[in-house]
Regions:
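Acidic catalytic loop of the alpha/beta-hydrolase fold
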Residues: 199-204, 228-229
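Flexible "cap/lid" loop of the alpha/beta hydrolase fold
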Residues: 96, 102-133
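Catalytic histidine-centered segment of alpha/beta-hydrolase-like enzymes
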Residues: 223-237
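Conserved HGGG/HGGXW glycine-rich cap/lid loop of the alpha/beta-hydrolase fold
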Residues: 4-52
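Conserved alpha/beta-hydrolase catalytic His-Asp/Glu region
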Residues: 117-118, 133-187
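Gly/Ala-rich beta-loop-alpha elbow adjacent to hydrolase catalytic centers
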Residues: 82-91
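Active-site loop/oxyanion-hole signature of alpha/beta-hydrolase fold enzymes
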Residues: 41-80, 240
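Short beta-strand/loop motif that positions the catalytic acidic residue
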Residues: 188-189, 195-197
Length: 248
């Protein structure tokens, strides 16, 4: 795991958690717009830190490592946690941690991907396909349709894939996504949590229902015309929405 710090050391603290096959560089266009006001901590999970020496295991394991970092470096306090796609798993575990205090959290694209009896078959097939994507930097047309993504947006994401991603890490991220919503997260009635997603994303209705069981005050925001992960490709809009959420 790698955590990079940017911006105003005296500003509000913000941590960014990336999506699948990505690393901290998924936010490279966003960070310059945040640096003046915020102290930004951009994370690369195990298996996606470009070293080839780490392996992604579970969302809970990543959350535990982040909690230890926040305890040590930030006195256990974080003002805002922003998680994209894969990052939403560690985020919900981190929010439930008794050792850290997170004031606000945004889950971007936390799709419900549990397909029940098909999960085992998916775990046999999809990690291999996504591993190929990581190394060939190519996304087939069916995957673009599934994500609601444009070719141009996907090319931007493909350029940000780090080196040395293993099949073991990819398989672990798929398991994390398929089974995330089977976890019974503690109810946090006063938690300031938002769920953001693109209009073209699928599998969000069930996700929102499950998230509301943990966060009864959940704020839901749908972005018209966007697919999965596309909000990050519009950094100025994302920053304005972050600032608006901060004022709620």
């Amino acid at each position: 795991m790698e955590i990079k710090r940017f911006g105003n050391i005296e500003g509000k603290t913000m941590m960014l958690l990336h999506g699948n096959l990505m690393c901290w560089q998924q936010f490279e266009d966003l960070i310059p717009l945040l640096e003046r006001k915020f102290c930004v901590y951009a994370v690369s999970f195990d298996g996606f830190d470009g070293t080839g020496e780490t392996t992604y295991t579970t969302a809970r394991d990543q959350a535990d490592k982040l909690a230890a970092y926040i305890e040590k470096e930030l006195d256990g306090q974080l003002d805002l946690l922003f998680a994209e796609s894969l990052g939403c798993g560690p985020a919900v575990f981190l929010k439930a941690s008794p050792t850290v205090q997170i004031d606000r959290m945004i889950l971007s694209g936390p799709e419900y991907l549990d397909f029940g009896v098909l999960n085992r078959l998916i775990l046999k097939v999809m990690p291999q396909k996504q591993y190929r994507t990581a190394h060939e930097k190519y996304m087939p047309a069916w995957a673009l349709r599934f994500m609601g993504q444009t070719e141009q947006g996907m090319q931007t994401m493909l350029r940000r894939i780090p080196d040395h991603i293993s099949l073991e890490s990819v398989r672990a991220t798929w398991a994390a996504g398929l089974y995330l919503y089977r976890t019974d997260f503690p109810v946090q009635p006063d938690a300031k949590v938002a769920c953001w997603y693109g209009e073209k994303e699928g599998h969000m209705k069930k996700a929102i229902q499950r998230l509301r069981t943990a966060y009864p005050s959940l704020i839901v925001r749908c972005f018209p015309g966007f697919g999965h992960g596309e909000l990050i490709l519009h950094p100025a809009l994302l920053v304005s929405e972050l600032e608006r959420f901060w004022l709620l």
